[in-house]
Regions:
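N-terminal accessory/precursor segments of enzymes
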Residues: 180-186, 190-191, 302-304, 342, ...
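A short C-terminal boundary segment appended to hydrolase-like catalytic domains
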Residues: 291-407
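Feature captures C-terminal
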Residues: 36-38, 48, 56-63, 67, ...
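Acidic, metal/ion-coordinating pockets
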Residues: 28-311, 369, 374-381, 441
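Bacterial N-terminal signal peptides that target proteins for export
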Residues: 1-11
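C-terminal segment of classical bacterial N-terminal signal peptides
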Residues: 8, 17-26
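Intrinsically disordered, low-complexity repeat and linker tracts
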Residues: 2-3, 24-32
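Acidic/histidine-rich, surface-exposed loop or edge segments in extracytoplasmic proteins
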Residues: 41-56, 348-365, 416-418, 515-517
Length: 517
């Protein structure tokens, strides 16, 4: 549904009555019967219910589902015609989820329990929902009291893995269709896990088009909740994993929610409002629609609201399972990851100094611009355990650190939170340099007059790999693809046809290396 056909009846009505009514009456006539629908969109909450960093054992100041709920309730009090949707990556990402509750999927899950309490109208699958295989995902999400959507994923029997690809929510007589679609790149990262190799992940743009056809005239408003970024991640030619391609092929979409990349998106293309948020519950996307008496959209706006100044909801924290899970996680960390009673306070080791230096320039993380002890540690471990010539690894966030003092499980999770598998693969010098160029794309090109290094917001922290076993330079004055200079291996220039072995985790191998051939 688009503005063009909605505005025409309204404009004709106004033009016919303009000569007959005074200005005040005209305004009242125009406002009569108007409806206001608010759609709130969250995504990539990654298990952060409380607003608490288990790695640092401290409250956070700007994130968490509890903060989101405060804003959600405030919005509902202002406009009861509010719809709440989510674009996935919610049941993964903290010690609470990954090390405790996702390993017992048949037990009540704190994230889904909190989402039920918050009153979600729909959720779209994210790629991280698949991390434990499809049966585990289905068991956990089966606890949801709201539809879970993925219009482009079917199992080996041809059935939608969540049972639904879209749903319709009615508010004030306005029927809002919500279509959920996840990046089709899931098999790149989670292939081999139960149920995934037999599943079909259809191109997002194609699947959304089919869903819109199915919906037909059942809805007044079309919302697409897409767990992917605006631009293609792997399929640059076909755009099967691109929200932009979804919109290009389906311009009748009224609201487009994007996710996955953990970056703020706030824009309008034509008459489609587009919004996306960062990770961990740091923001919420707000879409406000004004419709006339015939349910035609006459105005639409999007805003991404930062949660920094929002207080966490005690209601969410007081949900019995949430409170229990929070304390259970703290006990698990203090017990060295054992989770057993009586084993609290067990240290896994100790350090005499912090491994991450202070930022030399405000706003520019040291972990992104210099060699650090924490990165050296990760690469050293990978080299020693693989016997490879070169190691590549990333910090999952630029500030990941091992602080001075005792080391507990939370500290380890902070610097390496995923259960990846370490691979040793054979590469040529040319292939390694191409990989290094890909990593260096996270920087913006330096231009004359720039006073600081800056980063491309489309590249999250975890996509910047650093390399050990080779010496190299990055020339930021050069465009992407031409930045890696003077690569030295064992004191000699690395030749393109030279063969060496590389230690890299399975995630990066599948996404940045194998997928490139």
């Amino acid at each position: 549904m688009k503005f063009g056909k909605r505005l025409l009846p309204l404009l004709l009505t106004l033009s016919m009555t303009a000569s007959l009514l005074p200005a005040a009456a005209l305004a009242a006539e125009a406002d009569a019967g108007e409806k206001h629908i608010t759609i709130l969109g969250t995504s990539d909450m990654h298990g952060n219910i409380w607003g608490f960093s288990y790695e640092d054992n401290s409250e956070t100041a700007n994130n968490g589902m509890a903060r989101l709920y405060t804003y959600i309730q405030q919005t509902r009090s202002e406009n009861p015609n509010t719809i709440l949707i989510d674009a996935g990556d919610d049941i993964q990402g903290t010690i609470m989820t990954d090390d405790l509750y996702n390993k017992t999927p048949e037990d009540p899950h704190p994230v889904i329990t909190a989402m039920n309490y918050m009153g979600y109208d729909a959720m779209t699958l994210g790629n991280h929902e698949f991390n434990w295989g499809i049966p585990t995902m289905q068991t956990i999400l089966g606890q949801a009291e709201f539809p879970v959507l993925a219009t482009n994923v079917t199992d080996a029997a041809g059935e939608l893995v969540t049972g639904a690809g879209w749903t319709i929510v009615e508010k004030d007589g306005v029927k809002v269709a919500i279509i959920g679609v996840v990046t089709p790149d899931v098999p790149i990262w989670d292939g081999g896990k139960e149920g995934i190799d037999g599943a079909t992940f259809e191109a997002a743009n194609v699947a959304v088009g089919k869903a819109i056809d199915e919906i037909g005239d059942q809805a007044d408003v079309i919302v697409v909740s897409a767990h992917m970024g605006m631009y293609a991640e792997f399929d640059e030619e076909g755009g099967s994993d691109s929200a932009q391609k979804i919109l290009d092929d389906n311009p009748e979409i009224d609201v487009l929610q994007v996710a996955h990349n953990h970056v703020v998106v706030n824009e309008t293309q034509g008459t489609t409002v587009i919004g996306g948020v960062r990770n961990g519950g740091r923001d919420i996307a707000r879409f406000d629609l004004t419709l006339d008496a015939d349910n035609n959209i006459v105005d639409a706006t999007v805003e991404v609201v930062d949660m920094t100044d929002v207080a966490p909801s005690q209601e969410i924290r007081d949900i019995p399972l949430v409170a229990e899970a929070h304390q259970k996680t703290i006990d698990y960390i203090n017990g060295g990851g054992s989770g057993e009673d009586g084993e609290g306070g067990v240290a896994l080791g100790s350090t005499t100094a912090k491994f991450q230096p202070e930022n030399e320039i405000s706003g520019i993380p040291a972990g992104r611009v210099m060699d650090t002890a924490v990165m050296d540690l990760i690469n050293k471990i990978q080299l020693e355990n693989s016997g490879a010539d070169v190691s590549a690894a990333a910090l999952f966030k630029d500030t990941s650190d091992l602080p001075a003092g005792d080391i507990n499980y939370g500290n380890i999770f902070d610097i390496y939170k995923f259960d990846n598998t370490l691979y040793r693969v054979t590469v040529t010098g040319a292939e390694l340099k191409a990989y290094m160029e890909w990593s260096a794309e996270c920087y913006n090109q330096w231009k004359e007059g720039d006073i600081n290094i800056s980063f491309d917001p489309e590249y999250p922290d975890y996509l910047y790999d650093m390399f050990a076993g080779v010496d190299y330079e990055i020339d930021l004055s050069q465009p992407k693809g031409q930045r890696i200079k003077n690569v030295m291996f064992k004191g000699e220039p690395l030749q393109d046809d030279q063969t060496l072995t590389l230690a890299v985790n399975n995630y990066r191998y599948s996404s940045a290396l194998k997928s490139e051939g």
